[in-house]
UniProtKB/Swiss-Prot annotation:
Record function comment: Produces ATP from ADP in the presence of a proton gradient across the membrane. The alpha chain is a regulatory subunit.
Catalytically driven reaction(s): ATP + H2O + 4 H(+)(in) = ADP + phosphate + 5 H(+)(out)
A Pfam family hit: ATP-synt_ab_C
Signal peptide: none
Site feature location: Required for activity: S362
Residues given in the record as ATP binding sites: G169, D170, R171, K172, T173, G174, K175, T176
Keywords: ATP synthesis, ATP-binding, Cell membrane, CF(1), Hydrogen ion transport, Ion transport, Membrane, Nucleotide-binding, Translocase, Transport
Gene name, Swiss-Prot/TrEMBL: atpA
Entry-linked InterPro entries: ATP_synth_asu-like_sf, ATP_synth_asu_C, ATP_synth_asu_C_sf, ATP_synth_F1_a_nt-bd_dom, ATP_synth_F1_asu, ATPase_a/bsu_AS, ATPase_F1/V1/A1_a/bsu_N, ATPase_F1/V1/A1_a/bsu_N_sf
Species of the source: Leuconostoc citreum (strain KM20)
CDD domains named among the record's database cross-references: ATP-synt_F1_alpha_C (cd18113), ATP-synt_F1_alpha_N (cd18116), F1-ATPase_alpha_CD (cd01132)
A GO cellular component annotation in the UniProt record: plasma membrane
Entry protein name: ATP synthase subunit alpha
Amino acid sequence: MAIQAEEISALIKQQLEKFDTTLTVEEVGTVTYIGDGVARATGLANAMAGELLEFANGTFGMAQNLESSEVGIIILGGFDDIREGDTVKRTGRIMEVPVGEQLIGRVVNALGQPIDGLGEIKTDKFRPVEVKAPGVMQRKSVFEPLQTGIKAIDALVPIGRGQRELIIGDRKTGKTSLAIDTILNQKDQNMIVIYVAIGQKDSTVRTQVETLRQMGAMDYTIVVNAGPSEPAPMLYLAPYVGAAMGEEFMYNGKHVLIVYDDLSKQATAYRELSLILRRPPGREAYPGDVFYLHSRLLERAAKLSDELGGGSMTALPIIETQAGDVSAYIPTNVISITDGQVFLDADQFYAGVRPAIDAGTSVSRVGGDAQIKAMKKVAGTLRLDLASFRELESFAQFGSDLDAATQAKLARGRRTVEVLKQPLHKPMPVQHQVIVLYALTHGYIDDIAVEDIQRFQDELIAYVDANANDLFKVIIDTKQLPEESAMNAAIEAFKAGFAGSAAE
């Protein structure tokens, strides 16, 4: 076959035209140490703090330590394929995660990748994991309520949209249950929820996700999971990833609730990384910037000003204490960062008072402004009554000859404790709470036997719903307490029937 000279020259010309003369400059380093989710590399003199670096096998890492001759890198993912002597190059980018509506209803890992087996997440929106929190002038004071559906919280330690409220207590005192119930109550509240599970057992997270799915809560929830078997960098990053996902909605004028379950495990993971990176240890072997670890995360929760769309992100961080010691390092740090705390008491929990909220040590610093007027009126003296009851109760153990006024206070206190008990995964709408607490504070429950109180409140709600539904409508529409005469009449009418049924 004869080869035409013209064809050859045409092919050569074509190749020459395609030839790219531009040079691509890459800064490449060499891995000198690898292990425990951390790598060290030399030759990356211009690497920036927090920059994404790419290893030879395609795994990414993040520059954490910038030293004179080496860079300390936390590895984002598995590190089994990385060896000493491998190359690692700069990308010039910082870490970003996928965000947007497409993530709602999904379970993702700390890199935003789906782990629920429901296929890939198609989104073209990404946000950086580390972002500066909104400044003072970009914020607005908290004024809208976040209804948790838990009587003890909505009445005693109300939470507002844009607030940071810490849930703190020993292990197995119902911290996660409190958060899950709050998520369930957001069903018709126009909220998007992000649940960040940090170092929780995979079986536990699976159970929580199934609960949310059965109750229809996955329709507005994103779950970010960093399990205990994953490398420490994933546990460290997971909360920031959740915050980035929440900010996408917040800056678009929506309302977000984010639960960090729990930040004690994030602090432990960060301590592990810092020690491997040879950072100087401080109190309890945590690094010096462990306060900044949590403050820069929790400051990202805010109520934005009207100019920025008026969106909000409410944070419910969870901290686990050891034997009720809230004066340990991490608990005191997070208490000082947040706008109040819900303290769960192990003794009350084991005594059957659930949720085991300690009214004396729980506080909400800004939520009072967000409480609806009706709730403010009926719950005004509840906290003081409960605190004085606890005081009297311990005093009453030493003597039985108490005067009538003290006996009455103790009786009211026992009924208050009973009213504030609530079954698991049964959040109560605010209008129902108002009616029940009104009946309590106005003495209608004083002569009901303690063991009948749960039945009394359930039947009272059903009665008002069927016979005086306008009371609920007034509370929902105006946020005000209905006419006292109408409420008294409804409760008295119900009580007449209830007393009869109890006497049978």
